[in-house]
Amino acid sequence: MAKESMKAREVKRAKLVAKYAAKRAQLKAEGNYEALQALPKNASPVRLHNRCKITGRPKGYVRQFGISRIQLREMASNGLIPGVKKASW
């Protein structure tokens, strides 16, 4: 499990990205790169990192479900994800 502070940091970054999204797009369209640099670092969407909603794990993230591969396997095995089952042929 990831530290709570890491999870909170990602949430804070996501809020900051949403707050400055319109201003960032406007400055990019104008070509005003000096003003773009003056924005906070964490306002850039590049600094966001996908994390598992359950554990906060940063690696092995499956976008379709929003969880890590480990949690996906565990939940699918327990039948907690509708329509997902172990493959057999």
Swiss-Prot record:
SUPFAM superfamilies linked to this entry: Glucocorticoid receptor-like (DNA-binding domain) (SSF57716)
GO cellular component: cytoplasm; small ribosomal subunit
Domain of life: Bacteria
Disulfide bonds: none
Alphabetized InterPro entries for the sequence: Ribosomal_uS14 (IPR001209), Ribosomal_uS14_bac/plastid (IPR023036), Ribosomal_uS14_CS (IPR018271), Ribosomal_uS14_sf (IPR043140)
Keyword Cell division appears in the UniProt entry: no
Stretches of the chain forming a coiled coil according to its record: none
Function field: Binds 16S rRNA, required for the assembly of 30S particles and may also be responsible for determining the conformation of the 16S rRNA at the A site.
UniProt protein name: Small ribosomal subunit protein uS14
Species of provenance: Parabacteroides distasonis (strain ATCC 8503 / DSM 20701 / CIP 104284 / JCM 5825 / NCTC 11152)
Gene: rpsN
